Amino acid sequence: MVQSLHEFLEENINYLKENGLYNEIDTIEGANGPEIKINGKSYINLSSNNYLGLATNEDLKSAAKAAIDTHGVGAGAVRTINGTLDLHDELEETLAKFKGTEAAIAYQSGFNCNMAAISAVMNKNDAILSDELNHASIIDGCRLSKAKIIRVNHSDMDDLRAKAKEAVESGQYNKVMYITDGVFSMDGDVAKLPEIVEIAEEFGLLTYVDDAHGSGVMGKGAGTVKHFGLQDKIDFQIGTLSKAIGVVGGYVAGTKELIDWLKAQSRPFLFSTSLAPGDTKAITEAVKKLMDSTELHDKLWNNAQYLKNGLSKLGYDTGESETPITPVIIGDEKTTQEFSKRLKDEGVYVKSIVFPTVPRGTGRVRNMPTAAHTKDMLDEAIAAYEKVGKEMKLI
């Protein structure tokens, strides 16, 4: 007899719970700022991707409200029918200036970007070299393209060179692309873009950088590609509009020719209603803020260094992060989840990250300090880490 849906779900959900892999979802009452409220209790929030605090910025809220008054709450259609508003054109022109490219295209989410852009260019006659720690949306985008997927050891340039050479010299593929995160979200390390570009030029690879955690954070806000001064060397610059930018959506920046192709061939652009007017205007306001000033960027980095130093002094393993992302690596999945719960009891909200998001045995809580945190908040968080760590004999 075949297995019923109930039997399948019950068996597998129980397995997740028994092995410390089941993630309880909390509901936030109010805005997702540096402090949040859950079930009536306030917590210092170290789990959001709201790097610059823009999700609650008054200027962005005013811009969104004004756009709703003039353009309504929805775009009303897909971009290719009559869902392209003047607000979308303004946003894409602003994004292109921000990223130092000829053009840009906005999508409904960062996940959509990778589903859209990869499959619009790569197909079954091509090969994709992909860093083994790339985001799930990259993995799914690669699968959707039906290209040959070749995993590359994480940030291993010797492995990349060898596999690029093998793929190109095999003569089996029309195009070969290398895809990498700009900043890796679980450990906070940065892709070796100068070396990647050198290898790509040697073997004629297309280059694709998903800078979801780099936009607004690296390169004085313009991203990891700008940080290395390689705007004219990377074919695809991908970014989210939901993390440092503080709203929702994603984008691809590149040549006008590339963007024209994506507008003609990328399925999320063709078959999904465009970004809402309020969101679109708020995003444009956020990007202009980053272009006009580095104040929020600088505050983010100062807060990140302060927290990282405090946790390291306590004896925690904070990994090899080169960015504000600050993991505290515990290891065992069940211990990691218990650690997160104990911190929550002390008023610090920092979620556990365990398999399958990270490899087994590398469970961690991932701290995400923002520009909106005060030093008092960070001191309170560090004190909670000291108390819980000693009680659990982790430090």
Curated annotation (Swiss-Prot):
GO MF entry, a single one: transferase activity
CDD domains for the chain: KBL_like
Names of required cofactors: pyridoxal 5'-phosphate
Residue spans crossing the bilayer: none
Keyword Transferase: yes
Keywords: Pyridoxal phosphate, Transferase
BP GO annotations: biosynthetic process
Binding sites annotated in the UniProt record for pyridoxal 5'-phosphate: 110-111, 185, 210-213, 240-243
Residues annotated to bind substrate: 135, 357
Residues with N6-(pyridoxal phosphate)lysine modification: 243
Enzyme Commission (EC) number: 2.3.1.-
Cysteine disulfide links: none
SUPFAM superfamilies: PLP-dependent transferases
Pfam families: Aminotran_1_2
Family, similarity comment: Belongs to the class-II pyridoxal-phosphate-dependent aminotransferase family.
Self-association and partners: Homodimer.
Name by which UniProt lists this protein: Putative pyridoxal phosphate-dependent acyltransferase
Organism encoding this protein: Staphylococcus aureus (strain COL)
